[in-house]
Amino acid sequence: LAIYVIADVYRGAKPVPAQTAGISSVAQGEWQTKTDDQGEVVVTVTPQALDGNTAQWKFAVGLNTHSVSLDQDLTKVSVLIDGKGNRYKPIAWEGPGPGGHHRQGTLVFSAISPAPRSVEIIIKDIGGIPERTFAWELK
């Protein structure tokens, strides 16, 4: 499922100017796919469900490279941060385990209630980049 979602994002999507070097956004319905292409790994993150009606918030994640192995446990190198700076660890990774050069899956977090004005996902130590940040405004 996540593979199809990420593939659909690129089909007919219009790029939005990047706010920082190596980061870009692509509109996908209500949410934007954020892309970080620093170093040797391209990382994309797209919110899937971020509303008060769900018990879990899900983010589709894509990791693509041709030069390094993707050995990270994404539940250990990722964190969700709300607009007040509260940090939430993922409760699950739905996708292939560590290894390989192309990984797609879904990071799952417990829903934040009440919903914050903004959230960001930070993913650390992928492809030699200490930290990659992906942010969205919710309200």
Regions found by a protein language model. Name each.
Residues 41, 76-78, 117-119:
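Short beta-strand/loop motifs in extracellular/secreted proteins, especially
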Residues 44-92, 103:
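Mid-length scaffold segments of soluble, non-membrane domains
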Residues 48-50, 64-66, 112-114, 126, ...:
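Generic structural motif
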Residues 21-25, 66-72, 110-114:
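Short linear motifs in intrinsically disordered
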Residues 84-137:
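Short, solvent-exposed, Trp/other aromatic-anchored flexible loops in extracytoplasmic proteins
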